Amino acid sequence: NKKLPFWAGIVLAMKEEGISAPPISILDEDGQLTEATHKVLDIIAKYNMILTTGHISHEETFALVKAAAEEHNVKNIIITHVDFPTTYYTVEDQKKLADYGAHMEHCYTTYATKKVDYATTLEMIRAMGPEHVVVSTDLGQPTGLYPDEGMEAFATALYQDGFTAEQVRQMTVYNQRKLLGKD
């Protein structure tokens, strides 16, 4: 019996209260990005914001990232949870997305909660290279570690598994600064 993520408990409580939020898609019935999605991409590009993919489908991700990079000139893209079971991207998929300038996000909690084997996370990071990776924690829920503790644990694991201190800094600091327009 797996422990539910913190947010899943909220969704279940809302359902019990009769509150529902139907799923939405960024694609129309023809598989094209909706007009509303294009408007959001225009805003992201205009203000040099970061586009993240969240938990959307692979079909949506590839359509979104292609349009963001090619049609809207979005410069800062993160593919969220690339090694999470429901949003899992192969290294081949990640390389295609990186061709659009996207960074791949790996979260401490994904392997720490045994949703993926750490060796898989490590293999993906090595295949992509630190220049295409951002690491985060996905922590902050009231029942878990503090985010800084998770980041320290992830950085330490990467260092112990052969990444240099500079490579770890690239994945934990420099790539994020670049995405934020601070470099």
Residue spans for each PLM region:
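Histidine/acidic-residue-rich catalytic or RNA/ligand-binding cores of hydrolases
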Residues: F62-A67, Y88-Q94, K114-I125, T143-T156, ...
